[in-house]
Amino acid sequence: MAEEIVVGRIGRPHGIRGEVTIEIRTDVPHRRFVVGAVLGREGGGTALTVSGAHWHSGRLLLHFRGVDDRGAAEALRGVLLTIDADQAGSPLDDADGDGEAVEMWWDRDLVGLRAVTTAGMLLGHVTDIIHSPAGDLLAIGGPDGGEHLVPFVRDIVPTVDPPAGRIVVDPPPGLLDLD
């Protein structure tokens, strides 16, 4: 069985005709969520085929074949949408179509990386990536058993180097209690 990559999470229903909001977990929603796309469900279950897709007030709304009312849409709330890893392509593909590679990583590529500060101090290892509407956070498990939540933005995480097995964190004052 091929490895699955999560590309989205189904949110609340929108309207009465089966549309749902999507929490996007891919940098290429214009390629992943097109009409006719077949998306798996994390852990198995019947695949979902996109039969309609559009943006409304900054949110992606999808309609799936066979999901024709609010009740059916509500039953899908929280489902993680997946693709097979072999369908994903390289995370360094030209994701936005401008002819240049885009720097992005799959969650699975980040979990387990060693996290160090710009001064070389070990913070721990990446244990999870938390996706939220406000932005992504890296959960870093410390050697003392504690956990740091670090906003995954270039200003704070300037270096991500999976081949070297590390990320570099440049925390602003007050972000981490390092004393």
Swiss-Prot record:
GO terms for molecular function: ribosome binding. Gene3D superfamilies: PRC-barrel domain, RimM. Pfam families: PRC_RimM (PF24986), RimM (PF01782). It is found in: Cytoplasm. Belongs to the RimM family. The lineage of its organism: Bacteria, Bacillati, Actinomycetota, Actinomycetes, Frankiales. The PRC barrel domain binds ribosomal protein uS19. Its main location: cytoplasm. This is Ribosome maturation factor RimM. The keyword Cell wall biogenesis/degradation does not apply. Transmembrane segments: none annotated. One of its GO terms (biological process) is ribosomal small subunit biogenesis. Keywords: Chaperone, Cytoplasm, Ribosome biogenesis, rRNA processing. Residues 102-175 form the PRC barrel domain. An accessory protein needed during the final step in the assembly of 30S ribosomal subunit, possibly for assembly of the head region. Essential for efficient processing of 16S rRNA. May be needed both before and after RbfA during the maturation of 16S rRNA. It has affinity for free ribosomal 30S subunits but not for 70S ribosomes.
